Amino acid sequence: MTPTVWYYVRDLDASRRFYRETLGFEEDAVDFDERWSHLRRGAMEVGLSEGEPQEDGAVAHVDVDDVKSEAERLRAEGVEVGVVVEIPQGVMRILDVYDPDGNRIQLAQEL
């Protein structure tokens, strides 16, 4: 599992061009209906989702086998977590987790 940094971008098409043409990333997945793209360059992976950019910038995206069990485990340990969200069309489940300084990390499970 490779960590992926996700950015919310206002214009997915412009951002896709920037990462491919300007920074040399290769796009390995895109969903025009859900408005997201996944790109990689070497060991670096970047995900782009169309939406309003977040105040805190990028989100570290970490793949896990079972988001629901991770949510239960982390809550039991007293870690601040959000709610498990299933992406429409059953593509993946995500969970926002916060480190001791309030930095957001997103756990994700492909379905």
Residue map of PLM features:
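Conserved short beta-strand elements that form part of the metal-binding/catalytic scaffold
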Residues: 26-58, 104-109
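Mid-chain, well-packed structural core segment of small domains
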Residues: 60-74, 85
